[in-house]
Each structure stands twice: as structure tokens, then as C-alpha cells.
Amino acid sequence: MRRIDPSKLELEERLVTVNRVAKVVKGGRRFRFAALVVVGDKNGHVGFGTGKAQEVPEAIRKAVEDAKKNLIEVPMVGTTIPHEIIGRFGAGNILLKPASEGTGVIAGGPVRAVLELAGVADILSKSLGSNTPINMIRATLQGLSELKRAEDVAKLRGKSVEELLG
């Protein structure tokens, strides 16, 4: 899989969660902030990143930097995805279904952020299993990265799209 250069894209970022995490030491607890950010250009490119620091803005900056390193390309057919797929990561499963134009993004929380920043305008999604934000995002991105257009599958099989679709 080739790496996507973030400097050539106009990326928009969206903060999904900020968590206060603690490290318990002899003298008490040491608090830090963990941020989860999704970035995308609303045109088929999306990624997520995590960052941890003692201050919230610094954690967010680190998360954005990380997200730009983890961009994936999302194949689209018009305003939706080419086919139904279940993205799996850990205990989090996300069902992604293509929808007709005008349906909108039917998704909850973190999944909505990923799909909107990827540029998918019409889609149905359902969270199955764990709904921990990071697992939902990872499952969604795993599902989106496995999508294939009919043209790509036809090319791999050495057939025309008409032959493939019957």
C-alpha cells in the first residue's frame, strides 16, 4: 500500500475524544491527556491518530501529526461506497452499507466523523460489539481500506465490468 502525502491534501481535522489518563506512582497519580483525532479531505482520504501529553493542546497536536501519517484512500461510487462490508478490530465490528443518494450519513459518534471526513455522503452503518471510540474508528478504517471498486476487481480477474456484474 502506497503512502499518501498529507502536504498535497487540504485536510480537515476533527477531535473525537480527549481522555484524562493516570499513571499511579509512589507519591500519587500522574495525570496526562490522551487525544483521538480524525483527519480527512472529504474527497476519499481519511486517517486517525492518537496523542498523549501533559496538556490538552499538545496531545491534540501530536494526534493530528500521527493521523496525517496514517491516511488511507477510500474507493467511492458517487456519494457512497461500492459494496457492503463489516470492518473488524478487536471486539469492535462496524457494518457499513451503501445507501441511495439523499440518505445522508447514518452513523454514530466516532464512525460519523470518519465517514464525513472521508467524503462519504450517503451510507448506513451499525456498530456491532464494542463501542469504544478507538476500536470503532479502527474497525471503520479497516472496513473502508478493504473496499474495492467493480473496475478494480474486474481488472484483477482479467474480465470486463459487464462480465463481472452479469
Swiss-Prot record:
Which superkingdom, per the lineage?
Answer: Bacteria
Pfam family name, one: Ribosomal_S5
Keyword presence, rRNA-binding: yes
GO cellular component terms, semicolon-separated: cytosolic small ribosomal subunit
BP GO terms, sorted: response to antibiotic; translation
UniProt GO MF annotations:
rRNA binding; structural constituent of ribosome
Effect recorded for G104R: In rpsE9; suppresses S12 mutation K55D. Lethal in the absence of the S12 mutation
Instruction: Please provide the record's keywords in A-Z order.
Output: Antibiotic resistance, Ribonucleoprotein, Ribosomal protein, RNA-binding, rRNA-binding
Domain called S5 DRBM: residue spans: 11-74
Protein family according to the UniProt entry? Belongs to the universal ribosomal protein uS5 family.
Misc remark: Altered S5 proteins have been identified in a number of mutants. Some mutations in S5 have been shown to increase translational error frequencies.
Q: What does this protein do?
A: With S4 and S12 plays an important role in translational accuracy; many suppressors of streptomycin-dependent mutants of protein S12 are found in this protein, some but not all of which decrease translational accuracy (ram, ribosomal ambiguity mutations).
Q: Which PANTHER family match?
A: MITOCHONDRIAL RIBOSOMAL PROTEIN S5
Q: How does it assemble?
A: Part of the 30S ribosomal subunit. Contacts proteins S4 and S8.
What does the entry note on its domains? The N-terminal domain interacts with the head of the 30S subunit; the C-terminal domain interacts with the body and contacts protein S4. The interaction surface between S4 and S5 is involved in control of translational fidelity.
Q: Name the NCBIfam families for this protein.
A: rpsE_bact
**Protein name according to UniProt:** Small ribosomal subunit protein uS5
The primary gene name is rpsE
